[in-house]
Amino acid sequence: DWVTKKSQTDRHLALYLREWGRKYPNRGYGGMFLRWLLSKELSSPYNSFGNGSAMRVSPCGFYAQSLDEALFLAKQSAEVTHNHPEGIKGAQSVAAAIYLAKTGSTKAIIKEYIENNFGYDLSRTCDEIRRVYKFNETCQETCPEAIIAFLESHDYESAIRLGISLGGDSDTIGAIVGGM
């Protein structure tokens, strides 16, 4: 609802996130998000660079009518909680990949755009990542890996399987890859 109404503010989004989060409080949210969610006051963003901003951003990429709009909506979506530059960057990189895929860009174009605009190293393979990957819930250690799984995939199922097979925060990686 928030993404489709141009008159909605960051406060509306924060209230919307809290409404849904409180309706479903036992979903394995990150600790900082859960504290924000359950606080009595609608508190300020908490400077997070966790991957929650990237996990929830897919509607922004799907709804956007331009790449600039996808980036703008992703930034707005991230900033209400994950206002650290890496949290915003992670959300924007995923929304950009989704928008570019939705509009018919090749995987080579998507890879080049993400590398050039977000500085992610997408030259590794899933096999290389899998050998050394550990649990990490930051955008900078989750988003590139999810994007690589998408780039290596052949269809939706293989994307999800590749993402989850990396290990680490695999449910979040699966959610991110699934949006792409």
Task: Set out the residue ranges of the language-model regions.
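Structured, active/binding-site neighborhoods that engage oxygen-rich ligands
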Residues: D1-M180
